[in-house]
């Protein structure tokens, strides 16, 4: 029986993964080693019961008594806290879904790779913050990383069986978010509620706002660089409002391979779960005649400066991605709390990158996770200062 673990089980990716696992037979088809979640203890316990999980972990130690009570008599072990989540990743599983949002997903993802099995990576921050270290760890341990972002899953599939030396360019698409047709002045004054209202995808608050600012796409550009290894001048993003084409790969013979799929994360999750084969995934089928037209346009970097900042990070590499991600997370916290404006987020990130770029770690290829965490800590402090100054100016 195939074994699996789901990190971030109660988030949107985790829920979709759980749904697909249950459709494929649940505990009759899989041995669930570990499930982790946040404060939604009721849902985490429901999942653990349904999958007969060996271990359930909440990220919050204060929630542990509730989890223990909810799973009493089931035979499922329970634990709480960041260290417990990291230790859960030390339990070998054939297939691990890494869906914890933010830099918190880096440690369990790294530890899971050391078993030399398959990591389905939905936590883009892992590649952004420690891409070179992550890929090296996978190679050294004979592990496989499968991208779960719809765009990177699309690139992965388009490259199957191809000679990467013949790849001229990789194009990932962006919906443009809720502000794709808004003026700069209107974007500047937007509210949190407006920023989190995504037109195409059903996602959580933070990733929806990242999509609106195109910081999500900026992370994905960096992720493409780190996962596939292409040079920055061969990687680009285009706005594609229909969200049907997820990525395109251009080859040296002039051909352009496009991957089309529904705007449903279960498509990419299902591909990773069924890999190296394919299996039934319950998503809507595309009707091209009904869609009628697919449109593309260049993104406006004045309205969405995150893309420009991403190119700087792609060129610098080293631990610049860790600084970028840390600053982005702090800036997002301040925007959600109403302390800074929408466009201030990019300014905070840019000021943070400038401030920490003189540190020896900034351009260094990391040798250990501790270096990644050190840059993350340094950038978070710098971003807090930058955000505080922006707040004072409002």
From Swiss-Prot:
Alphabetical keyword list: Isoprene biosynthesis, Manganese, Metal-binding, NADP, Oxidoreductase
Keyword NADP appears in the UniProt entry: yes
The protein's required cofactors: Mg(2+); Mn(2+)
Residues reported to bind NADPH: 10-13, 38-40, 123, 125, 204
Signal peptide: none
GO biological process, one term: isopentenyl diphosphate biosynthetic process, methylerythritol 4-phosphate pathway involved in terpenoid biosynthetic process
InterPro entries: DXP_reductoisomerase, DXP_reductoisomerase_C, DXP_reductoisomerase_N, DXPR_C, DXPR_C_sf, NAD(P)-bd_dom_sf
Highest rank taxon of the organism: Bacteria
Enzyme class: oxidoreductase
Entry binding sites for Mn(2+): 149, 151, 220
EC number: 1.1.1.267
This protein's pathway: Isoprenoid biosynthesis; isopentenyl diphosphate biosynthesis via DXP pathway; isopentenyl diphosphate from 1-deoxy-D-xylulose 5-phosphate: step 1/6
Keyword Metal-binding: yes
An annotated Gene Ontology molecular function: 1-deoxy-D-xylulose-5-phosphate reductoisomerase activity
Record's catalysed reaction(s): 2-C-methyl-D-erythritol 4-phosphate + NADP(+) = 1-deoxy-D-xylulose 5-phosphate + NADPH + H(+)
Binding site for 1-deoxy-D-xylulose 5-phosphate: 124, 150-151, 175, 198, 211, 216-217, 220
Stated role: Catalyzes the NADPH-dependent rearrangement and reduction of 1-deoxy-D-xylulose-5-phosphate (DXP) to 2-C-methyl-D-erythritol 4-phosphate (MEP).
Family: Belongs to the DXR family.
PANTHER family in the record: 1-DEOXY-D-XYLULOSE 5-PHOSPHATE REDUCTOISOMERASE (PTHR30525), 1-DEOXY-D-XYLULOSE 5-PHOSPHATE REDUCTOISOMERASE, CHLOROPLASTIC (PTHR30525:SF0)
HAMAP family the UniProt entry points to: DXP_reductoisom
Protein name per the record: 1-deoxy-D-xylulose 5-phosphate reductoisomerase
The species this protein was found in: Cereibacter sphaeroides (strain ATCC 17029 / ATH 2.4.9)
Lineage: Bacteria, Pseudomonadati, Pseudomonadota, Alphaproteobacteria, Rhodobacterales
Name of encoding gene: dxr
């Amino acid at each position: 029986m195939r074994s699996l673990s789901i990190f971030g089980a109660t988030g949107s990716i985790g829920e979709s993964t759980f749904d697909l696992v249950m459709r494929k037979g649940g505990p009759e088809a899989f041995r669930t080693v570990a499930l982790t979640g946040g404060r939604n203890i009721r849902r985490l316990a429901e999942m653990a019961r349904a999958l007969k999980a060996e271990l359930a972990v909440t990220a919050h130690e204060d929630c542990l008594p509730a989890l223990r009570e909810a799973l009493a008599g089931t035979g499922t072990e329970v634990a709480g806290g960041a260290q417990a989540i990291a230790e859960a990743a030390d339990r070998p599983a054939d297939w691990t879904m890494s869906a914890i949002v933010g830099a918190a997903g880096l440690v369990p993802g790294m530890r899971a790779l050391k078993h030399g099995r398959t990591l389905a990576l939905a936590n883009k921050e892992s590649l952004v913050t420690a891409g070179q270290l992550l890929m090296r760890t996978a190679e050294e341990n004979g592990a496989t990383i499968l991208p779960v972002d719809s765009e990177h899953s699309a690139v992965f599939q388009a490259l199957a069986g191809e000679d990467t030396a013949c790849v001229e360019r990789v194009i990932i698409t962006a919906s443009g978010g809720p502000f794709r047709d808004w003026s700069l002045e209107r974007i500047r004054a937007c509210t949190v509620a407006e920023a989190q209202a995504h037109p195409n995808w059903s996602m959580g608050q933070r990733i929806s706002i990242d999509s609106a600012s195109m910081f999500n796409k900026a992370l994905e550009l960096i992720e493409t660089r780190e996962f596939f290894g292409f040079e920055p001048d061969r990687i680009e993003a285009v706005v594609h409002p229909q969200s049907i084409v997820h990525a395109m790969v251009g080859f040296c013979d002039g051909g352009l391979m496009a991957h089309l799929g529904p705007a449903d994360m279960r498509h990419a999750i299902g591909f990773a779960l069924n890999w190296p084969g394919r299996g039934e995934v319950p998503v809507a089928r595309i009707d091209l005649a009904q869609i009628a037209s697919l449109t593309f346009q260049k993104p406006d970097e004045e309205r969405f400066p995150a893309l420009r900042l991403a190119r700087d990070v792609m060129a610098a590499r080293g631990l610049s991605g860790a600084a970028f991600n840390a600053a982005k997370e702090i800036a997002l916290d301040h925007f959600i709390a109403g302390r800074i404006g929408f466009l201030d987020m990019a300014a905070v990130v840019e000021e943070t990158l400038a401030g920490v770029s003189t540190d020896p770690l900034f351009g260094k290829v990391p040798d250990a996770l501790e270096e990644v965490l050190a840059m993350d800590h340094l950038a978070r402090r710098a971003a807090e200062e930058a955000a505080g100054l922006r707040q004072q100016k409002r």
